[in-house]
Structures are given as structure tokens and as C-alpha cells.
Amino acid sequence: RFNGKLYFCVDFQHVKPGKGNTFMRVTLKSIVDGRTLEHRFDISEKLEDVRVERRQYQYLYKEAEDFIFMNQEDYEQIPLLGDLITGVDFLKEGDVCEVVFDTSTETVLYAELPVKTVLEVTYTEPGEKGNTATNAMKDATVETGASVRVPLFINTGDKIRIDTRTGEYTERVK
């Protein structure tokens, strides 16, 4: 916790200049809105630790603005707003996600999809033969409705693996 907000550390660097005091250069990412912040901490500065717990939840369905998840151990269902879910565009029914809780307040901080997911292409323009010399890409729509850039050889009905953090195509799945 820094300045009353929750962050996680993305990167840090211990700096010991020739003159002056040692300090830490830290890149923090807000859990609430995903914004990054770079800050310089003196070695004497202290931050409040926040205990978090990761639990496996299965996505069931969408109801209005809420995404309904079920705890796989006790079958408790919880609603989450789409803003709290990383990679929400690639979420499909039955996917198992990690939901991160603040253990002191039992509130949901965010939910993460697996890093890679397999989705079926529901629509894409047919690729033209002979256009394989370059790394040409085209738009495709996957079963969740998200749009992804794919190579020309991908056709409607193919299953593809997508990196949920970046939204990029990684490979075709047979």
C-alpha cells in the first residue's frame, strides 16, 4: 500500500550513487486502475504490506454488467465487474481464473485469466494464396467476440492460442 492505494511491484532497481544516499527506483502498477507509477524510495522508507490470497474460481455467465464466478471448493458464487478482470475480452464460460483477495478485508482486488487461452475463430476473411512471403496479418473474430490479428493461413473454424495479457495470436492449435 502506497499513498493509501494498492499497488504491486513491476520492477525495482537498487541504486548506490557515488555521492549521496542509497535509494530504490521502483515501478508500481495500481491494482485498481492498472496505471503505472515510478517512484524513488529512500532506504529508510517503509511500505505497508498487504496480504493477498489467490483462489481458483470458474467463470459461469454474465449478468448485466457483472461476471459471475464460482469458487470450485465451496461453490460460492461472486459477481465481478469487468474492470477487475485482466483479459476480459477472452473470457469464455467454464474458464478457470485466479481471483485475488485482500485477506484483511476479504474484498476482491482483481481476477486474472490464464496467460494463454485457446479460442475458436468465428469469422475471418479467407487468406489469399501466395501471400506467405511476408509476415502479413489479418483481422479475425474469436468465439468471445474479441478481435485478434492473425496470420493469413488462419481460417474460420480454426482454434488459436492467444496471450490474454497482450491479446496477440501465438499459434494455431490442432
Where are these regions (language model features)?
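Acidic-enriched and Gly/Ser
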Residues: 1-143, 147-174
